[in-house]
Amino acid sequence: MAKEELIQFEGLVTEILPDARYRVQLDAGHEIVAYTAGKMKKNRIKTLAGDRVTVEMSPYDLEKGRLIFRHKDERPATSGGPPRGGAQRGGQFRRR
């Protein structure tokens, strides 16, 4: 199937299902089951319930889709403590 035939929708992840699948409520009102695209898996992009996503669907099966993009949050990040990483221990490497 050519890429030109795929349809893109935006929606909200409502539920995380087994086997790396998600239930997504589309802006159009439909609810579908979607899986994570390979590029999102490769780049370790995590998707949680409540995330805004872009879904790619085939015009032949409008019940299934593929998550191709997770939109960044509009809410400001909160500082919950000291920065993570090696800065608080004085270096990047662990002593033996």
Curated annotation (Swiss-Prot):
Main subcellular location: cytoplasm
InterPro entries: NA-bd_OB-fold, RNA-binding_domain_S1_IF1, S1_domain, TIF_IF1
Record's keyword terms, sorted: Cytoplasm, Initiation factor, Protein biosynthesis, RNA-binding, rRNA-binding
Name of one Pfam family that matches: eIF-1a
GO cellular component: cytosol
Annotated region described as Disordered, given as residue ranges: 71-96
Keyword Protein biosynthesis assigned: yes
Gene3D superfamilies on file: Nucleic acid-binding proteins (2.40.50.140)
Keyword RNA-binding: yes
Compartments where located: Cytoplasm
GO MF entries: ribosome binding; rRNA binding; translation initiation factor activity
Domain S1-like, first and last residues per copy: 1-72
Function recorded in the entry: One of the essential components for the initiation of protein synthesis. Stabilizes the binding of IF-2 and IF-3 on the 30S subunit to which N-formylmethionyl-tRNA(fMet) subsequently binds. Helps modulate mRNA selection, yielding the 30S pre-initiation complex (PIC). Upon addition of the 50S ribosomal subunit IF-1, IF-2 and IF-3 are released leaving the mature 70S translation initiation complex.
Family classification: Belongs to the IF-1 family.
Subunit architecture: Component of the 30S ribosomal translation pre-initiation complex which assembles on the 30S ribosome in the order IF-2 and IF-3, IF-1 and N-formylmethionyl-tRNA(fMet); mRNA recruitment can occur at any time during PIC assembly.
PANTHER family according to UniProt: TRANSLATION INITIATION FACTOR IF-1, CHLOROPLASTIC (PTHR33370:SF1)
UniProt cross-references to NCBIfam families, sorted A to Z: infA
Protein's UniProt name: Translation initiation factor IF-1
Taxonomic placement: Bacteria, Pseudomonadati, Pseudomonadota, Alphaproteobacteria, Hyphomicrobiales
Gene coding for it: infA
